[in-house]
Amino acid sequence: MHVLFIIDPLPLLKAYKDSSVAMMQALQARGHTLSVALQGDLYIDAGEVRTRFAPIALRDGADLHGHDWWRETGAADEAPLARFDAVVMRKDPPFDMEYVYSTHLLEYAQQQGARVFNSGAAIRNHPEKLAITEFPDLTTPTLVTRDMARIRAFHAAQGDVIVKPLDDMGGTGIFRLQRSEPNLNAILETLTDNGTRTIMAQRYIPEIVKGDKRILLIGGEPMPYSLARIPLAGETRGNLAAGGRGVAQPLSERDLHLARTVADRLAGRGLLLVGLDVIGDYITEVNVTSPTCFVEITEQTGFNVPEMFAVALESAAG
């Protein structure tokens, strides 16, 4: 297969721990050809969705901590997305309007015969914070609003809550508001931009000290290990980008129940790869844009997550 990755600039990736790079390694090892494009390389001309792209290969034995782990194998070119055997959307959030426009282009490309994973419509229809509202029986009490009075009432009722923006990643903009929080109003004014920006509030889950678990669904199947991202002392965010420590562990019975319930519900929606965030017994996010933790789980357990993704992509792309 010729696989196109729509991805952030390669020099900016931390290749040694980047899940997209791990995917590329697995696909290249299985004999597939790789190309990359940036989000801004997508365009429509005369009704056809096309992209500028660069064919690449990963260097054998390269130090992934350096900057020469990949090489271009030919001149940059342009082609319709439908010409590739598979298009893998791996652009990281924020999920801004440019991202939304990209999902529309990907959806149009699919209508023209492109095979896109995750599909443009599926990414757009499952915003990562909001998607949990489809599963109220699997989540902690949750409120989505920009009404500061409503958030204050929710906080008063729950006593200890987490508030966060809907369109960020890596733990950015997340606050814990305990009952006696003296800066409650200032935090809400900032996050909601004085009541003009919708945010999410959730009852605090004390099991965060044991880790914010990332559970991966690939081709509708739960991977047997999660990565528990354990917060630094004094932190409420387990995200690795916020300094959390990742510890791989087998799925518990509850984890497996959550994963299978979500997988069954999402079946047939164009989501080849999903990352569930689980704290305690509850799902806190459903990640569909650029789920990570492939490398950490593989290195700690020996279970080859990138290989599983490559096999699933081959099957899905036909």
UniProtKB/Swiss-Prot annotation:
It comes from the Bacteria. Keywords: ATP-binding, Glutathione biosynthesis, Ligase, Magnesium, Manganese, Metal-binding, Nucleotide-binding. PANTHER family: GLUTATHIONE SYNTHETASE (PTHR21621:SF4), RIBOSOMAL PROTEIN S6 MODIFICATION PROTEIN (PTHR21621). One of its GO terms (cellular component) is cytoplasm. GO terms for molecular function: ATP binding; glutathione synthase activity; metal ion binding. Pathway: Sulfur metabolism; glutathione biosynthesis; glutathione from L-cysteine and L-glutamate: step 2/2. ATP binds at residues 155-211. Residues 129-314 form the ATP-grasp domain. The gene is gshB. Its EC number is 6.3.2.3. Binds 1 Mg(2+) or Mn(2+) ion per subunit. Its cofactor is Mg(2+); Mn(2+). This is Glutathione synthetase. It is an enzyme of class 6 (ligase). Pfam families: GSH-S_ATP, GSH-S_N.
